[in-house]
Each structure stands twice: as C-alpha cells, then as structure tokens.
C-alpha cells in the first residue's frame, strides 16, 4: 500500500485517540498524527512517521510533548438568542428558584421577547461571537438549537440563522441545527393541543422539507411539554426523518428519559432528577445520556446527573456546555471538564471521551470525536500533556492550536506555547 501524502503533521505529541470506549482516552505517548486533506491519514509512533508517511511538503506542528485530542463536540447549545437575564440571576442568588422566576414572567419568556425583537444580523453576530469562543477552546462541532422564538414563523427564522452561522464562521466549525420545542408560545397557551397539532402538521414538515434541521428536541418538564405532548411532536419528527432528542428530568422527574428510550432518541439530556427506572430504560435502548454540569452549577443546585450510575449501567454519555442565557451562561470548556470530574464523578479520561466521542455519538456523527485513519481531521493541541491536567487546571483555556478538516483555524499566541516534555 502506498504511503499517504500528508498536508499537516502534528508530532512529538501525546495523542488521545478517544476510540477505545468510555473510560479509555487511548493515550499514545511519543506519537504523531498525519492529515491528508480533510481526513486523518495515519496515527502512530513519532519515530515511524517518515517510514509510513510522505510528509515532505506538509505543514508541521511540533507538539513538544503536548496532548493532541479529537476536536471537541459540543452536542448541546442554545447560541441563538438576544437580551440578557442578569436580573433573573440576581433573583436566584437571593433565593428564588428557576421555576419560581419562570412562573412569575421570567425565564424563557424574557429571552423570547428579546429574541423576537432582534434583527437577524444581530442574532447572527451574537451567535457567531459565542461560537468563536467555543472554537478558541477546542470545539470543532457545535449543535445549535432554535427554541427562543416559540411560534412557527420565529422558529423557522431562528433555524435559518443557524444555517447561516456555519458560513459566518468561515467553516471553522461544523454547525448541526436542531429544532427545539422549548415551551408553548404565549399566544397559544389556551390551546396547547392545537399548538401541538399545528406543529406536527405544518412546522415539522416544513423544517424537514427545507432541511433546516437534522434533529428535533423537546423540553419535557413542568411548565414546558408533558410526555404525551412530546411523544406526538417527536414521532412526527421521526416520521419526517428528523432525529429525536429530549431535555429530560432536569428540574423534576417528568418521564422524559423513558420517553427517549421508547422513541429511540439519540440522546436524553440533563437527567439531574433521573431515577433507577430511567437509568435502566436508557441502558436498554442505548440512548446517550447528555451530561450538562454547567447548568447544575449555574442554577445553584447540588443535584447533578447520576453519571457514575449511568456509566456502570452501560449507558453511553456525552458532555456539553449547554450554553444558554437562563441556566448556563458560559462557554467555558475547561470548567465543564472539571465539573464533570468534581461533581459528576467522571475520571478525566471519561470526561474527555464524553466531550469527543460521546458528543459525536449523541449527534450520530461517526467520523467525529476520534483520531483514527479515515476520521475527520478535527484536532486540538493542548498546552499540557494529559487529560488530568485539562481537568485539574480549572476554567483555563489550554488550547494552543485547533484544526478543522485539516486546516488550522485557531492558534494561541506564541507566548502561550509550552514544552510539556
């Protein structure tokens, strides 16, 4: 077999392939990765590079003992919104709960009003700025939900903005749009059944027809959608070729996890109030459990998702930021990794795999989240030599170079380069 001709090489690295299961980062010390075009062409021992790869004309990055991982996959975000909820944050700091604030006219309703009033270009620019902050921290794939428009015209508008986001970023990240049913629009709260029927008959088919989203997500929660309502929406989405997902068991045990298992959802996210029956249902159906620890921290709760029980039951897990204005106003990747270890009980290796291969699985993207021949060349060089260091040095951006489809899309200043050997 002829040697691949590399266009980019990262060498003298500790490579984490993230392709050996949920608890093994697949660490290869003294390793190199060769990229040909948009794909990984070879990964192996650095000393074997010249014999295995034609790298004479390649761009070479000397990792100096640094960790090289797959690009992170942020599988749950709400980047498209306007306005702020700082006042609501202050109320919660004074003792009001998230549900109390929402029921008194705050919460999603505040963001919906601001988002509906904002012009497209403002929403796009703000979403792009948030995405850029994620990219600079090693995220190369971002799932982006609609959900703050609530009614059909606004949800369609938001999804079209999400579609423009990839171009606005110049291809520096893959953007995967999701149609999110966040709550019943205020104009239709008196006819919930009518809203669901209309969404199933009109909105979902239009989203599928125009290919505005690959996923459909429903917030199954008190004050949002009941399981029976969510079942109708998600089944209609499945029938139109959209992949179903759910927000489940975040604030109350509402049955969302069992619904996810019943419908074969790609993921059930949040799960702070998940019970043993829900764990068993997710395990049997092989639904990915989406872990979002920034939300638990931001809401001032100590009820984190039962990550260890999920892993021990054989449930695949993902880790994501859940960046949104109400329950996780942060794009901090490092803090997310640290919380996964400190509060969810994951090892640093498990947290890294969940943020790479786990996110790819939740989004059904088999060529993402791993370093292997033929996989997408989405890579990150970190200014440290291990997953443990990433989680230990909290809330710091350790990303030195970010590669998307074989192209360096972000590089830290030279002063940030460190020798990890």
Swiss-Prot record:
UniProt subcellular location: Cytoplasm
Keywords: Cytoplasm, Histidine metabolism, Hydrolase, Iron, Metal-binding, Zinc
Pathway given in the UniProt record: Amino-acid degradation; L-histidine degradation into L-glutamate; N-formimidoyl-L-glutamate from L-histidine: step 3/3
Example of a GO biological process term: L-histidine catabolic process to glutamate and formamide
GO terms under cellular component: cytoplasm
The UniProt record lists the keyword Zinc: yes
Any one GO molecular-function label of the UniProt entry: zinc ion binding
Family as reported in the entry's similarity comment: Belongs to the metallo-dependent hydrolases superfamily. HutI family.
Protein's UniProt name: Imidazolonepropionase
Encoding gene (name): hutI
């Amino acid at each position: 077999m002829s040697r691949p001709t590399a266009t980019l090489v990262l060498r003298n690295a500790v490579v984490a392939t993230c392709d050996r299961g949920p608890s093994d980062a697949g660490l290869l010390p003294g390793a190199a990765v060769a990229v040909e075009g948009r794909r990984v062409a070879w990964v192996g021992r650095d000393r074997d590079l010249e014999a295995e790869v034609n790298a004479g004309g390649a761009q070479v990055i000397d990792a100096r003992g640094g960790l090289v991982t797959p690009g992170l996959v942020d599988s749950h975000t709400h980047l498209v919104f306007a306005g702020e909820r700082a006042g609501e944050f202050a109320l919660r700091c004074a003792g009001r709960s998230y549900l109390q604030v929402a029921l008194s006219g705050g919460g999603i309703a505040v963001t919906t009003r601001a988002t509906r009033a904002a012009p497209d270009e403002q929403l796009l620019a703000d979403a792009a700025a948030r995405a850029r902050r994620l990219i600079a921290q090693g995220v190369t794939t971002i799932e982006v939900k609609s959900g703050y428009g609530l009614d059909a015209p606004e949800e369609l508008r938001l999804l079209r903005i999400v579609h423009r986001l990839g171009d606005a970023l110049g291809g520096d990240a893959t953007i995967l749009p999701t149609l999110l049913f966040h709550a019943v629009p205020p104009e239709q709260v008196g006819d919930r059944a009518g809203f669901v029927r209309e969404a199933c008959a009109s909105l979902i088919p239009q989203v599928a027809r125009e290919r505005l989203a690959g996923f459909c997500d429903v917030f199954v929660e008190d004050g949002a959608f009941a399981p029976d309502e969510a079942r109708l929406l998600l089944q209609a989405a499945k029938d139109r070729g959209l992949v179903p997902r759910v927000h489940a068991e975040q604030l109350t045990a509402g049955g969302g996890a069992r619904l996810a298992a019943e419908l074969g959802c790609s993921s059930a996210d949040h799960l702070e109030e998940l019970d043993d029956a829900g764990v068993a249902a997710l395990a049997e159906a092989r639904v990915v459990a989406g872990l979002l620890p920034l939300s638990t921290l931001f809401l001032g709760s100590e009820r984190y998702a039962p990550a260890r029980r999920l892993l021990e039951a054989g449930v695949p897990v993902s880790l994501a930021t859940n960046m949104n204005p109400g329950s996780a106003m942060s794009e901090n990747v490092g803090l997310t990794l640290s919380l996964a270890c400190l509060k969810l009980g994951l090892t640093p290796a498990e947290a890294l795999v969940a943020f790479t291969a786990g996110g790819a699985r939740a989004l059904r993207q088999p060529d993402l989240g791993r370093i292997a021949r033929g996989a997408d060349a989405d890579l990150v060089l970190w200014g440290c030599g291990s997953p443990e260091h990433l989680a230990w040095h909290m809330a710091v951006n350790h990303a030195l170079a970010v590669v998307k489809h074989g192209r360096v899309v972000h590089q830290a200043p030279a002063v940030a380069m460190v020798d990890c050997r």
